[in-house]
Amino acid sequence: GLVTKKFNDFFLVDLKNHGDFENSEKFLCKVRKSINFKDQLIYVGDEVVIENIDLKSKRAVITSLKKRKNLLVRPSVANISNIYITFSVEEPELNLSQVNRFLISAESMGVEVSLVLTKCDLISNTRRSLLIDKFEKWGYQTITLNLERSDYFNNFLAELKQKKCSIFMGPSGVGKTTLLNMIIPGLQNSTAPVSNKIKRGKNTTRNVELFSISNQSYIVDTPGFNMQPL
């Protein structure tokens, strides 16, 4: 199964598409005391093997940890397939040097990296086109989101549902939480306004958790970043 949440010594493991479980079926698990993972911790996103499954209480025991493909350090999440570097074009204003630092950090993961530009309803179509051209010349797919154009979001959501495990990375206040609330109905993470003084947002997400958005896809809900993860 897939570890979708971690808290204290417990792990929430989803058995969707594993064995007899076609739909999402989550179990609260602890690691078997006799198991030694060679000092290797278990993270959200890890694939694990569970036994002693109790269908009534939804409890089980983790007996082994499968080899992971990658591990993001901050926040700690494993087996990412896609990273979407997310920045707003206004409020706060786009900072190209900061975008570059996030891109460099993401590239070190060895996964597919794309750019998402939010709040594009605050700029002209001309500037939007110039930004797309600039970043695509850098070699990155660039997705623009506009509150007045639902088709932009719907096209992006369709793309996300084709990916295995996607994460949004970027500074606070750029709209990651709002975007996650749109992608995952019922999530309802709180949002916070951008500070007029420091021109940055406040982190509104506290715990790392995976949410299923299709039979094959998950989205990582993570704490925001105030600065570049380098």
Feature names for model-found ranges:
Residues 80-87, 109-118, 139-145:
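Conserved beta-strand/loop subsegment of P-loop NTPase cores
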Residues 1-96:
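N-terminal accessory targeting/assembly segments
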Residues 69, 186-217:
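Switch I (effector-binding) loop of TRAFAC-class P-loop GTPase G-domains
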Residues 121-174:
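Canonical P-loop GTPase G-domain recognition
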Residues 82, 112, 164, 215-218:
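Loop/turn-to-beta-strand initiation segments
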Residues 97-108:
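Histidine-anchored nucleotide/phosphate-binding helix
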Residues 54-56, 89-92, 120-123, 148-151, ...:
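Conserved nucleotide-binding/hydrolysis micro-motifs of P-loop NTPases
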